[in-house]
Design a protein with these regions (language model features):
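Structured alpha/beta reader/binder surfaces that contact nucleic acids or chromatin modification marks
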Residues: 5-23, 27-169
Length: 169
């Protein structure tokens, strides 16, 4: 005899999409950069920019309205489920980056194709390698793996696209 299949309770995602604020995109994200790194980007040798996961960058890259919503609903299982499944995202998407030095004597505007967070662990580094052909973190990862280091640094990463403008030669 057939066993009746009970449908799983579906989280009313649409309801939370309406209730929950959406993280606002950042049209132009200002970042300080060493000139030699800017030149690597221009030559096409640097495809991803990394920034340490710090309070300063969290303040700029996480949407306060979404964070406040999540704080107000931290005991709501459906909201937490929607967050885990990626239907609610507090990280703001960056559309372009305005790189410059301290004195603003030069600038480099670059399209940002994607941005997210990562830890210095094999899975995350492999993602960056496979998707953006970036090997900047390979040595640091190998070192931590060799030392069997438990605590791993976290970063924000920005996948760089087309050059939008510059005054660098």
């Amino acid at each position: 005899s057939m066993v009746p299949i009970t449908p799983l309770r579906v989280v009313p995602i649409q309801r939370y999409r309406q209730l929950c604020p959406t993280a606002e995109d950042i049209e132009v994200f200002n970042l300080l950069l060493l000139r030699k790194n800017a030149e690597e980007i221009l030559k096409g040798d640097k495809s991803v920019e990394f920034r340490v996961y710090s309070p300063m960058h969290c303040e700029r890259l996480y949407d306060k309205n979404v964070l406040n919503f999540l704080k107000r609903h931290e005991d709501n299982k459906e909201v937490q489920q929607a967050l885990e499944k990626g239907f609610i995202e507090p990280l703001r998407m960056v559309n372009s980056i305005h790189f410059h030095n301290y004195t603003n004597s030069w600038y480099l505007d670059v399209e940002c194709k994607a941005n997210d967070t990562m830890a210095l662990i094999p899975r995350d580094v492999k993602f960056i390698q496979d998707n953006f052909n970036c090997h900047e973190l390979d040595e640091a990862l190998a070192d931590l793996e060799t030392r069997k280091e438990k605590n791993r640094p976290c970063y924000f990463w920005f996948a760089l696209g087309d050059i939008l403008g510059t005054n660098l030669e």
